[in-house]
Regions:
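Short alpha-helix in the alpha/beta-hydrolase fold that links the catalytic acid
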Residues: 56, 215, 229-238
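Gly/Ala-rich beta-loop-alpha elbow adjacent to hydrolase catalytic centers
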Residues: 112-116, 120
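Active-site nucleophile loop of the alpha/beta-hydrolase fold
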Residues: 133-144
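Catalytic histidine-centered segment of alpha/beta-hydrolase-like enzymes
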Residues: 253-266
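Catalytic histidine neighborhood in serine/cysteine hydrolases
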Residues: 234, 238-256
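Short beta-strand/loop motif that positions the catalytic acidic residue
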Residues: 213, 219-221, 225
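Conserved alpha/beta-hydrolase
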Residues: 60-79
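Active-site nucleophile elbow and catalytic-triad environment of alpha/beta-hydrolase enzymes
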Residues: 25, 192-210
Length: 278
């Protein structure tokens, strides 16, 4: 059963958004009437929103999982909220959610996308999760130059860039792509150096922790990913020595592989997640 009634205590003590949350960005849960013994925590990426994860959430629910998809503070509202939130807020809301799930379920898995994979790694290094899925992991982002971003952040709070909606992507949230315009206006038509600094913090921590993870881990690289570097995925996967580590490369997939241009690539990504968690 789908519900947008998520535990608000996960956000206690964190940045409180001033802007309204768009419909697509609402946190949601999918819970069985008879409580499942297994749960999965889905974590979206940088300037992302829960609606991007509707497809894997639906399939995981149908496979018997209770599904939890929290919205990260500062995202899905306004650019002002984004720059006022921090990596601490993003990480802590997921940590709070995971702690609760570990107390309530026999097994808990994490499925994360893009920057969410960095949060997933950090959580898996501190908590006992059953499986960890890292889709289009943000190990390296060719356009992100930490030194240059640090310099720009001294002088620029907001750099405008060109953006337009791409109807080729198959978004699965109700009413899609109704919220693309407002999210594009607030997030995707801007570079916020201060927010990127927060992403870099997570990236540094996750890369340091990844080789020491013991959780069974699936890494999914997308051949046409123009945001993160798919060639780095297998290289970094080899650094992990404990537990099962599986790396797959999906042809024709883009960075947004859970609502992709290619239905075949999207299906392959979701199938890989389900098979790994089964």
């Amino acid at each position: 059963m789908l519900s947008f009634d998520i535990n608000r205590s996960w956000y206690d003590g964190l940045y409180q958004d001033e802007g309204s949350v768009v419909s697509a960005a609402r946190s949601f849960v999918m819970l069985h009437e008879e409580k499942s013994e297994k749960a999965v925590l889905l974590i979206h990426g940088y300037a992302g929103y829960p609606g991007e994860l509707v497809r894997p959430a639906n399939d995981l629910y149908d496979a018997g999982f209770d599904v939890y998809v929290p919205r990260l503070p500062g995202m899905g509202t306004t650019g002002k909220d984004f720059v006022n939130s921090s990596s601490h807020d993003w990480l802590t809301v997921c940590s709070n959610a995971l702690k609760e799930l570990l107390l309530s379920y026999d097994s808990v898995d994490i499925v994360a996308h893009s920057m969410g994979t960095l949060i997933g790694i950090i959580l898996a290094s501190s908590f006992s999760v059953n499986h960890l899925v890292l889709a289009a992991p943000a190990f390296k982002m060719p356009a992100l130059k930490p030194a240059l971003n640090k310099f720009l952040s001294l002088f620029k709070k907001d750099i405008s860039i060109a953006w337009q909606s791409d109807p080729r992507y198959h978004l699965h949230y109700e009413g899609a792509p109704a919220d693309d315009a407002i999210l594009g206006k607030e997030y995707w038509s801007h570079i916020y150096p201060s927010a990127l600094k927060e992403l870099i913090k997570l990236q540094k921590s996750a890369l340091k922790l990844f080789p020491h993870l013991s959780a069974d881990t699936l890494l999914i690289a997308a051949s046409n990913d123009q945001i993160t570097d798919p060639l780095m995925v297998e290289k970094i996967a080899l650094e992990k020595k404990k537990g099962i580590t599986k790396c797959i490369y999906i042809k024709d997939a883009t960075h947004y592989l859970f609502y992709d241009i290619s239905p075949k690539a999207e299906d392959e990504a979701v199938k890989a997640v389900l098979e790994f968690l089964s």
